[in-house]
């Protein structure tokens, strides 16, 4: 389920308030499911939050250790947790670990800017990977520019890279 940035921020702010201004595995663990749901989080997401919180508290997931791993092992470790998919793992690699060569071809926002940039409707994974191969080893940096283009509203204007 995709959330708008505004809705996501609101949920985060509510959770932050419930956790006493600091969201930690311990503070989240102390909350009831009902309290977490009251932030606007679905039952399924409450379950996923519990899974991640339990993994951190048990030591089976250590975010500091993820920094030391290459990209694929990070994706594998994160997606092994119920509720975390490839999209989430890639966003973590790009925006938290600042990895330079992650291509988020599954992301709707990325694909919206990609369609605008290349004036195409073909957003199949094979096509996107082929066209973006020239971005290596800086795919994440290019993706960040495409996200910024979307944030600025530029995709609402006509543009074609090869005019």
Specify the residue positions occupied by each region the protein language model found.
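C-terminal accessory module of base-excision DNA glycosylases/AP lyases that mediates lesion recognition
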Residues: 86-163
